UniProtKB/Swiss-Prot annotation:
Coiled coil: none annotated. It comes from the Bacteria. It comes from Synechococcus sp. (strain JA-3-3Ab). Disulfide bonds: none annotated. F-type ATPases have 2 components, CF(1) - the catalytic core - and CF(0) - the membrane proton channel. CF(1) has five subunits: alpha(3), beta(3), gamma(1), delta(1), epsilon(1). CF(0) has four main subunits: a(1), b(1), b'(1) and c(9-12). This is ATP synthase subunit beta.
Amino acid sequence: MVTATATATNVGYITQVIGPVIDAEFPSGKLPEIYNALKVEATTESGLKVKVTFEVQQLLGDNRVRAVAMSSTDGLVRGMPVVDTGAPITVPVGEATLGRIFNVLGEPVDQGEPVQAKEFAPIHRSAPPFVELTVKPEPFETGIKVIDLLAPFKRGGKVGLFGGAGVGKTVLIQELIHNIAEEHSGLSVFAGVGERTREGNDLYNEMKESGVLDKVALVYGQMNEPPGARMRVGLTALTMAEYFRDVNKQDVLLFIDNIFRFVQAGSEVSALLGRMPSAVGYQPTLATEMGNLQERITSTKQGSITSVQAVYVPADDLTDPAPATTFAHLDSTVVLSRSLAAKGIYPAVDPLDSSSTILQADIVGEEHYNTAQAVKQTLQRYKELQDIIAILGLDELSEEDKLVVARARRIERFLSQPFFVAEVFTGSPGKYVKLEDTIKGFQRILSGELDHLPEQAFYLVGTIEEAIEKAEKLKSK
């Protein structure tokens, strides 16, 4: 016999279990609304305690609803009581969430103390109205030279971070969290969507060691969890970030890794709900689901949510519906290059492949725009000359091209930078470089003023003054 452990006014019972999806019947006139959270708390005949939260997705008629599970449905049987909570999934928000790891339901999973949150918020809400949005596009300084110069982040914008395994995505994410915490007194929220459990664990431990954990809230929906949890974990993290923006009036960074897995989970749920698949087997509601998430990530008059999203591209096909739908929402793309990582240039951001919609003279200013274009032109010319150099050697180039190559190699090295969060590995103190110092440094390299300095002087330094100082030390050796 199945015994109920929950008492509530609106109780139905399970009529069908299909993997992570259930159908439940409720009394006439007491149907739960779409997105309401349902709870099953019961004990099976074998003595197994079952506690599962569901989210209503469809109203089927005949007083029945179809709902998707947020955790494993093992042990569920027909006839078990289902309680309608009368509201969507609500999660803790505010300062109490910092330094903790949560699951999709806002429950701490780091074996720490219970979360003493004063406020809770539903994960489903509308995007801010137009009148609340800030109109003026404004660059967001990160202190990382290559990003600030060539792919500037837009305050309240969305950045796509493209990179394979081992090229430095996690370290770049940690450095951004560190810099926003130190320089902007800002906070970060990290959403692990379909993350490997090991990666999530590593990130938590690395943040603890580097001292940025107290400025970040972590929300994980791992690979092994049901599609419902992976589909909603991004909204849980976003809800926590929205509180810091709207109530605390702060600038927040929201990291989502990986946005493709959010789409993938939505596709699984769509199939389980019996919807007709769309192109390449994706859900017909792909653009709507993506829009509902992305439109909430924005700048308002109170504060901003700037989002950095890792994007996996299936089979390197940029026309695949998942990345193609994501691209429509991005303001900047930061591409991490394996060839730069192999040269030891970190962060391994590809200066020619990375771009930003706000790199325009009327937004960032003439000086910044012209410097960025000159840097790109120099690096592009160097790239074109590399085949000639490989076949004929450097000596066969014209004097003008030799000069371009020399400056491009200095620029390439000056785009590298020591990170605060990597101090324990490199032994070099981290550097936060202000935008005006970044622009000034590249202008001096481009002008030829520093042609006499050795290339090595520009490697892993912050400002151009440090490069000159390093050159003096190298000379004295």
